[in-house]
């Protein structure tokens, strides 16, 4: 939150690689954008916008239960499962 003086007022979220939508986030008045797979130059070229690269898998996988519930409600005859073998290929260390 360095770019906004420690305050966050409006956040845009893009699951997966959504760096191309940075201009739209700014146009919508967002001061923070959470997505993944950002390029080095995205951080250098974007002033006044907090960028958070939260990882590709974590930003997409989180919606799987919601999508599954939607599909089950609208297509009850179709069996839906969430993969247990699909895992994040990146290990994060803090």
Region annotations inferred by a language model:
Residues 1-94:
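Active-site catalytic microenvironments in core metabolic enzymes, especially phosphate/sugar-handling
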């Amino acid at each position: 939150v360095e770019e906004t003086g420690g305050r966050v007022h409006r956040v845009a979220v893009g699951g997966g690689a959504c760096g191309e939508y940075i201009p739209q986030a700014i146009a919508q008045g967002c001061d923070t954008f959470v997505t993944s797979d950002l390029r080095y130059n995205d951080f250098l070229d974007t002033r006044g916008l907090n960028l958070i690269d939260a990882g590709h898998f974590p930003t997409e996988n989180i919606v799987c239960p919601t999508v599954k519930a939607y599909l089950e409600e609208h297509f009850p005859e179709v069996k839906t499962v969430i993969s247990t073998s699909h895992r994040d290929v990146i290990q994060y260390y803090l």
